[in-house]
């Protein structure tokens, strides 16, 4: 399963992400218009075994791909979830060019929502 690059538009959420079962590749993309790293990504492998955590700051998009048969996350968020406030960017945006570790993954499973996201250029998402 791959969860595309998603975010809250009016209520940006910071997330401290930890995996308590399985393994994922977790990604954050900077969407702060005045940032020198706007449109750049950072990713880490998080697993129950390595016990790493990743902080995704507010005004960043967040995505992940599950690398194990199953995975469970724990999030600590800075803002409540607002389902009507969701936005996103296509997971394979060529300008962002996330290097997803997809070796050994036969089929990428995306939600209907994630299939509809446009590129960063097309969506013009900036904070």
Give the residues covered by each predicted segment.
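Non-catalytic, conserved peripheral segments adjacent to functional cores
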Residues: 1-50, 68-70, 75-127
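Conserved SET/PR-domain catalytic core that frames the SAM/AdoMet-binding pocket
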Residues: 47-64
């Amino acid at each position: 399963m791959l969860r595309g690059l998603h975010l809250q538009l009016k209520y940006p959420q910071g997330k401290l992400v930890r995996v308590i079962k399985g393994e994922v590749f977790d990604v954050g993309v900077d969407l702060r218009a005045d940032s020198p790293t706007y449109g750049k990504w950072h990713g880490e492998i998080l697993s129950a075994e390595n016990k790493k955590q990743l902080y995704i700051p507010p005004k960043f998009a967040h995505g992940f791909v599950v690398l194990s048969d199953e995975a469970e996350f724990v999030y600590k968020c800075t803002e409540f979830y607002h389902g009507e406030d969701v936005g996103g960017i296509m997971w394979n945006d060529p300008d962002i060019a996330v290097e997803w570790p997809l070796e050994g993954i036969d089929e990428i499973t995306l939600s209907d929502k994630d299939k509809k996201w446009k590129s960063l250029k097309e969506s013009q998402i900036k904070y």
